[in-house]
UniProtKB/Swiss-Prot annotation:
It is found in: Secreted. This is U1-theraphotoxin-Sp1a. Residues 1-22 form the signal peptide. Probable ion channel inhibitor. Shows insecticidal activity. Acts synergistically with the neonicotinoid insecticide imidacloprid. Is neither a repellent that repels insects nor an attractant that is preferentially consumed by insects. Is very stable. Expressed by the venom gland. Its main location: secreted.
Amino acid sequence: MIFLLPSIISVMLLAEPVLMLGDTEDADLMEMVQLSRPFFNPIIRAVELVELREERQRDCGHLHDPCPNDRPGHRTCCIGLQCRYGKCLVRVGR
């Protein structure tokens, strides 16, 4: 069995028609991709969580952004800011 880095595997999968791999090499490559899938699943989930967190950060208002309260359930200002005078301003100490 051939041992390749994941990036090389993806390049080889994309270039498969050009390389014209034989049936055995193709089957070995596909088997290796299937066997490596459980290893990469946690990495894929972690990347998805990071993307979700970045999406949530974009959904909030940054400093001096307007913060309309007409969207119920939507966090209008980012963490550390509060909505005052219709804009997201620095949170005043408690």
